[in-house]
From Swiss-Prot:
Stored SUPFAM superfamilies: NAD(P)-binding Rossmann-fold domains
Cellular component, GO annotation: plasma membrane
Protein's name in the database: Glutathione-regulated potassium-efflux system protein KefB
HAMAP family: K_H_efflux_KefB (MF_01412)
Main location: membrane
Domain RCK N-terminal as annotated: residue spans: 402-521
Annotated transmembrane regions: 4-24, 29-49, 55-75, 87-107, 115-135, 152-172, 177-197, 207-227, 230-250, 268-288, 291-311, 324-344, 355-375
Pfam families in alphabetical order: Na_H_Exchanger, TrkA_N
Keyword list, A-Z: Antiport, Cell inner membrane, Cell membrane, Ion transport, Membrane, Potassium, Potassium transport, Transmembrane, Transmembrane helix, Transport
UniProt-listed InterPro entries: Cation/H_exchanger_TM, K/H_exchanger, K_H_efflux_KefB, Na+/solute_symporter_sf, NAD(P)-bd_dom_sf, RCK_N
Cell location: Cell inner membrane
Family classification: Belongs to the monovalent cation:proton antiporter 2 (CPA2) transporter (TC 2.A.37) family. KefB subfamily.
Length: 603
């Protein structure tokens, strides 16, 4: 592509994403499917704006690369070791069983056995990008099914290496392609990367961080990710696996969160580009001429993978309510199939079967498009199962009256609130997206609804029209603000109370008219500060008064700075306000010191 062509392609990608994704979200089909449809629209079989799909698809794999780096940052080596059973047990079983079944079905359609084996392995793989994105959207990261799904995806990435090595063997050209000296050098280079990364990365980032220039730190992070990907690609290995290893090596470093912050914006954009590129690669000509064959193929592929995954989840001991989530999210074909089929085609494994190869490729792409829809069906099934009428023995002491309070989110923050309310005999209903948490809470008598709390129908089913208050404890600030807007629009009678992760979220809540909120660490930090004052010799009564004064004045400053909380030009005004409030605090505390102590020295 010429430079101007790349610029035009970039503009088209951005326009397609901006137009299609909000529309898809509004229709309730999800952002991933929106990206895929946008790709179909601008690709060679749609409006034809872009024709060089293969080059863009290869570039867009960087989205998966960045995603795997961030996942690596979240997994330290000890955590990875804990997952070894699920990675090499369930992961290996899924690939082998799915590949065997699918290869057998391909042989029934007159594929040569060598081509059928390659086809079965390629189809057994799932889309890392799509599965991880959907798991995050569905809140599966913390659940047992999400952990198991990640283990299977990681094994599939590891299986890329032997799968590619198998192709020349099946093509009968092993002697030409297997230079054992080269293979040995690649293994040594890979080991060298592991050792070098283990002992060099932290000192290098410590040196860069010492410069104090944030842009250089971001550039170094990009260099690490892209360099790892390029190095692994040169070795003929998975780029995503290389960046995942780099992430794991830095997972226990002090720079973990800064690295994640630097990479996150690039990850989102490039993942979107990847899904658009997959949509562009869909050959609608083959779909039109072989519609029935393609539809049957997609159904068979998805059904076989769901069957294998469901049975493995059952054998592994996954709860019945989570098995369909696990099976559904990994039911599609993956991007690795395109790479494997291309390699096999260059080795003439599919000679005489080019149309069949095209049909299989179209099947993989369409199977990706079915996954978001399939997960919506799974969500509806889970909603009916968990949000329908409950049996009496499932809820020992929760009565059938309408709730007084709805608690959204039941993580560590929400659990404390829920327990306090339940201890005081308040009628509460909990909305939670983590199905394993739903199962656990029902055992303890909580009235729980599974699903996304930003859905008006779910709020209505949970009793929002009759409840007095709603307590929002979402992890993501965006979800909190969206839920506040929905409640103000559809349930204006509700008293809204919310969790704020910090001052920025507190400002946003105040601007939205929510005055009852709690900053996540503010109260506990104040309490620890009070105890610190006591250990430094301040009388407990004065320390308590100092804590109360500080809380009141900090809240006053928070309200005064609302109009300028996002205005960098007026940061100096914020500093002046802080100094003024500190002076007021000092004067009031001097007045306090003149007063007699109000109670004894013991807490």
């Amino acid at each position: 592509m010429e430079g101007s062509d790349f610029l035009l392609a970039g503009v088209l990608f951005l326009f397609a994403a901006v137009a299609a994704v909000p529309l898809a979200s509004r229709l309730g089909i999800g952002a991933v499917l929106g990206y895929l449809l946008a790709g179909i629209a601008i690709g060679p079989w749609g409006l034809g704006f872009i024709s060089d799909v293969d080059e863009i698809l290869h570039f867009s794999e960087l989205g998966v690369v960045f995603l795997m780096f961030i996942i690596g940052l979240e997994l330290n080596p000890s955590k990875l070791w804990q997952l070894r059973r699920s990675i090499f047990g369930v992961g290996a079983a899924q690939v082998l069983l799915s590949a065997a079944l699918l290869a057998g079905l391909l042989m029934l359609t007159d594929f040569a056995w060598q081509a059928a084996v390659v086809g079965g392995i390629g189809l057994a793989m799932s889309s890392t990008a799509m599965a991880l994105q959907l798991m995050r959207e569905k809140g599966m990261n913390r659940s047992e099914s999400g952990q198991l799904g990640f283990s299977v995806l990681l094994f599939q990435d590891l299986a890329v290496i032997p799968a590619l090595a198998l192709v020349p063997l099946l093509a009968g050209s092993a002697d030409e392609h297997f230079d054992w000296m080269k293979i040995g050098m690649k293994v040594l280079a890979f080991v060298g990367m592991l050792i070098g990364g283990r002992y060099l990365l932290r000192p290098v980032f410590r040196f860069i961080a010492a410069s104090g220039v944030r842009e250089v730190f971001t550039a170094a992070t990009l260099l690490l990710v892209l360099g790892s990907a390029l190095f692994m690609d040169a070795l003929g290995l998975s780029m995503a696996l290389g960046t995942f290893i780099a992430g794991v090596l830095l997972a226990e470093s002090e720079y973990r969160h800064e690295l994640e912050t630097a990479i996150d914006p690039f990850k989102g954009l490039l993942l979107g580009l990847f899904f658009i590129s997959v949509g562009m690669s869909l050959n609608l000509g083959v779909l039109y001429t072989h519609l029935l064959w393609v539809v049957i193929s997609v159904v068979v592929l998805v059904a076989v993978k769901i069957l294998v995954l469901y049975l493995l989840a059952r054998l592994y001991g996954v709860r019945s309510s989570e098995r369909m989530q696990f099976a559904g999210v990994l039911s599609q074909g993956g991007e690795f199939a395109f790479v494997l089929f291309s390699t096999a085609s260059s080795q003439r494994l599919f000679q005489g079967d080019q149309m069949a190869l095209l049909l299989v490729t179209v099947t993989v792409t369409l199977s990706m498009m079915t996954t978001p829809l399939l997960m919506k069906l799974v969500d509806k099934w889970l909603s009916r199962q968990f949000n329908g009428p409950e049996e009496e023995d499932e809820k020992p002491w929760v009565n059938d009256d309408k709730p007084q309070v709805i608690v959204v989110g039941f993580g560590r923050f929400g659990q404390v609130i829920g327990r306090l309310l339940m201890a005081n005999k308040m009628r509460i209903t909990v909305l939670e997206r983590d199905i394993s948490a739903v199962n656990l809470m029902r055992k303890y008598g909580y009235k729980v609804y599974y699903g996304d709390a930003t859905q008006v129908d779910l709020l209505r089913s949970a009793g929002a029209e009759a409840a007095e208050s709603i307590v929002i404890t979402c992890n993501e600030p965006e979800d909190t603000m969206k839920l506040v807007e929905i409640c103000q629009q559809h349930f204006p009678h509700l008293h809204i109370l919310a969790r704020a992760r910090g001052r920025v979220e507190a400002h946003e809540l105040l601007q939205a008219g929510v005055t009852q909120f709690s900053r996540e660490t503010f109260s506990s930090a104040l309490e620890l500060g009070r105890k610190t004052l006591v250990t430094l010799g301040m009388h407990p009564h004065q320390a308590q008064r100092a804590q109360l004064h500080f809380r009141r004045l900090d809240m006053r400053m928070l309200r005064e700075l609302i109009p300028m909380h996002a205005d960098t030009v007026q940061i100096s005004r914020a500093r002046e306000a802080r100094r003024e409030l500190e002076e007021i605090f000092q004067r009031e505390m001097q007045q306090e010191r003149r007063q007699l102590d109000g109670w004894d020295e013991f807490e």
